[in-house]
């Protein structure tokens, strides 16, 4: 069983919102992503770390969730900052196709892989509201990590999904990365970063944890092999 990741699909199946206005890398990007998944099997896992759909409400997001459900393997999703349709986790789960799992304040175990996740927040947002949101996300991340610990048994592999980068432009340690180290996470996947000028390393290892950027435009619309 292999684990792959790709994020920031920004789907709009029923109400097309052209993404190529953001650059040629977005030309036919969904076709490129699908081609990159052709080698996946039904036993493999695909992680999608947020910004799944442009929809504003859950009913409008259903076609996008069905698109995700039709991708190969078992899918695990988290909320991104543009997923305005994602409000109640129970409501979201009621609309998920078979084989799609949503993580929020908890975790899921598939085979020998335990996956947790949370949206996170920008470490660079020093506004009062930003500090409040960052603190709240720390609590949620810790809840998910605790849930992972309860599911984990000897020999299991652990992956945490977070939408926002967990560190700053200098890749310095943060309260979020300290939590990952405390719980001994193997791999962290994240997205959110876009454009030619963003501070992006596709792979970075710090204190024994591998961090993988999976924003589709940053990885040439090709799913990243995680495990």
Regions found by a protein language model. Give the residues of each.
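Metal-dependent catalytic neighborhoods of phosphoester/phosphodiester hydrolases
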Residues: 16, 49-69, 84-98, 126-128, ...
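Active-site neighborhood of phospho(di)ester-bond hydrolases with catalytic His/Asp-centered motifs
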Residues: 5-7, 46-51, 75-81, 101-104, ...
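Conserved catalytic scaffold of divalent metal-dependent phosphoesterases
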Residues: 9-12, 86-172
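Short, charged, surface-exposed secondary-structure boundary motifs
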Residues: 86-88, 110-113, 188-189, 220-225
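His/acidic metal-ligating clusters that form di-metal
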Residues: 32-45, 69, 130-200
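N-terminal active-site segment of His-dependent metallophosphoesterases
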Residues: 1-70, 142-156
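Binuclear metal-dependent phosphoesterase catalytic core
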Residues: 15-17, 21-24, 31-35, 109, ...
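A short, conserved beta-to-alpha structural element at the edge of catalytic cores
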Residues: 28-39, 77-91, 225
